[in-house]
């Protein structure tokens, strides 16, 4: 729905977003202020690995995005920003080390031997890049109408070693 927000997190594998409908703002950085881009239907975003990212529906109607995690570990593991862990806990939500979310307000408890995900240390946080817009947008975003123009006579390679988005997320995309 409009104003639906996904909190800042990162994965250890690639995460590629396909905007199926609506208007979406993707933002990144520890506090979500390192950069942002607005994407619309048909656009593709291969957000860099190990970069905190979030997104929200900024359209006036329901929207849908599809996310694909790449590599050999399609679960990708999820790491929440420290302030996201704190906010979640204030609402009774606990993310376990294994990436499972428990709602303590609904009586859910972590199983024996399972621990809550620890906050990243200052040293760990300092090692996570605050990638600038000038790097992210040209290198990791493919706009629908650009892809359509390039696909007029043959398939347009979108994600791959010799594509618009030069990356190896564990799969390739052509339009």
Question: Which residues are covered by each model-predicted region?
Answer:
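Short, conserved beta-strand element in jelly-roll/cupin
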Residues: 10-30, 68-72, 175
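A generic "binding-loop/recognition-motif" signal
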Residues: 2-4, 12-13, 51-52, 61
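A short, N-terminal "cap"/entry segment at the start of jelly-roll beta-barrel domains
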Residues: 1, 96-175
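Double-stranded beta-helix
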Residues: 52-132
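Histidine-centered metal-chelating micro-motifs
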Residues: 4-7, 25, 43-45, 49-55
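Short histidine-centered beta-strand/loop micro-motifs
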Residues: 6-11, 28, 36-38, 56-57
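Short acidic-glycine-tyrosine-enriched beta hairpin
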Residues: 30-49
């Amino acid at each position: 729905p409009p104003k639906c927000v996904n909190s800042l997190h990162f994965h250890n594998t690639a995460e590629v977003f396909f905007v199926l409908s609506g208007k979406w703002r993707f933002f990144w950085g520890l506090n979500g202020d390192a950069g942002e881009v607005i994407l619309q239907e048909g656009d593709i975003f291969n957000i860099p690995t190990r970069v905190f990212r979030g997104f929200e529906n900024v359209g006036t109607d329901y929207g849908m995005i599809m996310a694909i995690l790449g590599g050999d570990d399609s679960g990708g593991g999820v790491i929440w920003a420290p302030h996201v862990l704190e906010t979640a806990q204030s609402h009774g939500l606990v993310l376990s080390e294994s990436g499972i979310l428990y709602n303590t307000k609904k009586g859910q408890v972590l199983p024996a031997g399972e621990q809550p995900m620890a906050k990243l240390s200052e040293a760990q946080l300092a090692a996570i890049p605050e990638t600038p817009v000038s790097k992210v947008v040209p290198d990791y975003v493919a706009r629908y109408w650009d892809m359509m123009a390039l696909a007029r006579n043959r398939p347009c390679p979108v994600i791959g070693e010799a594509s618009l988005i030069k990356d190896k997320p564990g799969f390739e995309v052509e339009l």
